[in-house]
């Protein structure tokens, strides 16, 4: 009982969080015995603490016992049976001792009490620590949490991929790991945008002092730092002047060793490091100080033998390293030592980065021996290869590209090198790509590159016996755009989202298209009939799978698009991936067909094979547009959506509106295209035009006259002239019945006059069509005579006068619309009209 009373008098008993907080609010050194409720405080140290109190007799020294089970702050100390003594200097942890080591306890308490007096009375910096054991536990927990989070993400990704696989339109999809953004984009057509407010990472500054630099410990210290998971953001060698050292350590100017410290820090070069950790850097200041260890080398060797100061320091002054003691101090020291350094922001915060594109050329000599190695280095440096092409330049092309260097000493050598073999042209993308690439390849002059940037591409892969370097890079945004256009001219291509993907994944595919840098110039939802589908796959006609392919393409809605970009044809085919989804999953796992394709027929997307094919098929599916030589798309109407509108009116005004409004493909060409032009196109069109005209004529011959009589006169007349091309839509049918035909009359009359001059050529181009049109004209005349009014009679006369022009126009309209094989039944006419629009 007396012993218990003595213990209570010597050590204040702390039983709850409130008492703990009150204890730590007191000034001075507090030695706390942390115990478990089931075993009680450590009785072995009572005599030692009593002796200390009696010998020292200092009011700033106090002792306490704290029950870990009832104090929230001590939660991590629960369940530990080893005696643990925490020492707090005015509420801040300054030391931890585990186990009963009387000499160490005695020595440490005396030293720490003396240091606390200096802190309180002289303003000396207090060294605050984190319990090393708890720090290790927290690091393990953090690693476990990160591993758990990664596993959770992996399982979520697998679940999402499984979800894709279970969808009817997705088929067998690769179960490779993909990013959250990729899955979200493919599944939902969305990506989470970055936050708008930038959050800087927490960083700290470390100086490797002159003694450690002189002793050759820099590389070993850096290796130790990296082993502990710290990221070194930048390094710099710096020799402080005495004035700089005095300013840097001004908080210590009242200490007796201050001048010695200043002289030492100015005695040789130091190594400055800026460190962070993880995505946010949170807690990096205290973690680095724990790694450095106590300032006093003897204490460090005794209490933290694995610390950097214990391993590399010499004495208290020459203790190898300096580390900032707070975030504020780190910011001040960084501004003093590295004023131009920009602290990185936490990923996912701040505005999205500005991505630039630049041109890179690998010249023939380096390409022949080092292609794969150089490409690997480029990708490892963070550049994304968006465009890639092997090019054999002619001398004229090389001189045109480098015309601004004409007259320089090495111009002829440069042209000789650029034409000596194939050049690899790359379109690279990265944040600040232009400047980053120029820094990566090094100075233009080889000697300068080897001296100032020995790790650069120009230094590593230089060509012997020449001053021509191995790589080229654009030097500005304007130059990059111009040079990319030289090697990767802007093109237009046709893209089709097939029925198996158009319903479920259309928006996701469009998002991927935009991410790849394509501009969608035109797009329409189209239900292809077999005739139009066959035009898309002419090259596969006769193959075993051809009929199944045509059946699939005409089985539902597709989306047809016109895409524009540098090297658009090859770029879209790369994004699509190989035709066989199984092969694509193995060789191009990020491609659309790898992710969404089922088999070679249901492989999600289609694209043109070359620019010429793209132009032909775009103009076939979008007859109201023209693909210009530079790849641009010219729309012949103000708005695509205007095609579906109906303009109703009477008289001359209504006729003019009707002429401008593209009610159908055949009508548009009939109203706007002269007969002479038709003849030329007919001749140039070659075999497809002839075949279409013939097929159209055969179908006209088979058409029963009685069926034509049941239709409005104007509609049948146009069918006669156009070889059954479905040029008349519902709007035109209504307009015809109401007598709105002046525009068509004017167009036909004009074509008749021109047709008199061009008639011989047109008769040679399409004899079958002309004969058919002549045979059908009487039937059309009889039908038109049933209409009331003088206007209808004039229409009939003009229709009879223009059989030759109608025949020529028919061939052109059929070729342009790609619908010469249409059946005359009304229901199918309507389907083809919807397809054309």
Curated annotation (Swiss-Prot):
Disulfide bonds join 39-42. One of its GO terms (biological process) is cell differentiation. Monomer. Probably required during the final stages of sperm tail maturation in the testis and/or epididymis, where extensive disulfide bonding of fibrous sheath (FS) proteins occurs. In vitro, it has neither nucleoside diphosphate kinase (NDPK) activity nor reducing activity on disulfide bonds. Exhibits a 3'-5' exonuclease activity with a preference for single-stranded DNA, suggesting roles in DNA proofreading and repair. Residues 652-670 have a biased composition (Acidic residues). Residues 6-115 form the Thioredoxin domain. Residues 805-819 have a biased composition (Gly residues). In the C-terminal section; belongs to the NDK family. It comes from the Eukaryota. One of its GO terms (molecular function) is nucleoside diphosphate kinase activity. Contains 3 inactive NDK domains that does not possess all residues considered to be crucial for the NDPK activity. Residues 201-345 are annotated as: NDK 1. This is Thioredoxin domain-containing protein 3 homolog. InterPro entries: NDK-like_dom, NDK-like_dom_sf, Nucleoside_diP_kinase, Nucleoside_diP_kinase_AS, Thioredoxin-like_sf, Thioredoxin_CS, Thioredoxin_domain, TXND_domain-containing. Its EC number is 3.1.-.-. Pfam families: NDK, Thioredoxin. Residues 355-491 are annotated as: NDK 2. Residues 671-707, 718-752, 766-787 have a biased composition (Low complexity). Residues 638-647 have a biased composition (Polar residues). It comes from Heliocidaris crassispina.
